[in-house]
Amino acid sequence: ARSARPFLHATAHPDLALRAGVPMQPAGTTLQPASLIFMLGGVDTDALPMLRHSRQGVNYHDLAIREALEALREREEVPLFGGPWYCGVLTPGVVLVNMTRTQADMADNREATAAECLLHEHVHLFTELLRRHVPAFRNASLLATATQTGVRETRRIRGFHTLTGEEYLHAVDFPDAVSRGCHPVDIHSASSTGQRCEFLKEAAFIPYRCLIAPGFPNLLVAGRSFSADAVASASVRVQASVMGLGQAAGAAA
């Protein structure tokens, strides 16, 4: 056993809180999928509309590549994908690609390991598909993958207050607000290529009560495992928002 005046839990999976007995939110029907980002070189970036992704409602992705992949799914095996989204870097001919996805409980070591292996296979498969079917990627080669699979959703604690999507989208101003969020509510489907993306009309507020649970006054939980429903979490889960929660938890401690 370990004792301390404050414990700050800012990891992706609230294992400490779980082992201490903090109640968790119900997982719901499905978790958002995990994705592995990869980097390609040899791309004809002059022919690729790098910063001009098609906008369909509020979803930004390369519509031409998406339609080509959807057509391919009808006659050959194409893994589940999202987007695709890509962005350039400072090196000409190099792009970062976000398109892989798989459903898994990434808080479970066995499922996480299986997902990691599967997504690395999909990276190679998608690289070959892009080479064969998208002219700008004809000479592309795989340069790197992310150090590990990106996880959008696992466990969340049940705190003194559970931030709801309704409160978040309407920017309810809480008296104990400690941080704000402005990223869209971004929910990726784990069973299709779909995505729900809803932009905020104004920056949302996140209350301190979402970082602590009844009966655990010296444990602060920051990051995407804070107390929120699936809709609010789908916005706050990104880097800038969770950094704000970490700063708030550190100041409170």
Where are these regions (language model features)?
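Flavin (FAD/FMN)-binding glycine-rich loop and adjacent Rossmann-like elements that form
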Residues: 2-252
